[in-house]
Amino acid sequence: MSVISMKQLLEAGVHFGHQTRRWNPKMKPYIFTERNGIHVIDLQKTVKLVDDAYNYVKNASQEGAVVLFVGTKKQAAEAVKEEALRAGQYYVNHRWLGGMLTNWNTIQTRVTRLKEINKMEEEGTFEVLPKKEVVLLNKERERLEKFIGGIADMPRIPDVMYIVDPHAEQIAVKEAKTLGIPVVAMVDTNADPEPIDVVIPANDDAIRAVKLITAKMADAIIEGRQGEDAAEDFVAEEAASEESLEELAEIVEGK
């Protein structure tokens, strides 16, 4: 039973890759065909690999894993934050700061500072400070919240990372590899799949595609933590239907 259907993938545009001239040859096993200068991802493989990723994340969640969602480009930022929070996990959805994981202790000093500023406001300190100082503190807090707010309560270095577009998030991938953190990722046709532990071949530039796959990873965490009935919008499909395959063929033929 698959957790995602061919129809869902088609409707979200998961099959559209990059221009052929921008491809990474290592993605060849995941490419169905090429049409009008664009690579088309093999969705039959994507269905299977989403299942693999779902089970991997679910099993990690059952063991109490801390999962970090990463996606800093505009197409991914909102979904990464929303789905990480829905799953009770953590996220980075603005620029990845070099050393965010490999320099964990230094990053924690900034987390402490963010919490200090929040505490000052909660305790009424802002009310007795000069307005100019409050303005500066709010600016500092806004910047800290933007870059590290999503990991402020993360109890430790993550056990698993889910990344949207490892090509754009190469620093995050390198840090994960340095620390031995397994990476699950949406990998488009322009990226190198080799550093990724669990590859999900998919269009990582379409908001709907990113939302669909990212939501499934959140569902996996929730199911792992709470049981089979907890994940939202669970869709089961024995295999890709002939109708879906015909629809894909029509799309790539431009009909």
Swiss-Prot record:
Cross-referenced Gene3D superfamilies: Glucose-6-phosphate isomerase like protein, domain 1, Helix hairpin bin
Full protein name: Small ribosomal subunit protein uS2
Question: Which GO MF terms are attached to this record?
Answer: structural constituent of ribosome
Q: Which GO terms describe its cellular component?
A: cytosolic small ribosomal subunit
Asked if the Swiss-Prot or TrEMBL record annotates the protein with the keyword tRNA processing, the reply is no
Any one biological process term the GO annotation gives:
translation
Keyword annotations from UniProtKB, A to Z: Ribonucleoprotein, Ribosomal protein
Q: Where is this region: Disordered?
A: 233-255
Q: Which organism is it from?
A: Lactococcus lactis subsp. cremoris (strain MG1363)
Supply the NCBIfam families for this chain: rpsB_bact (TIGR01011)
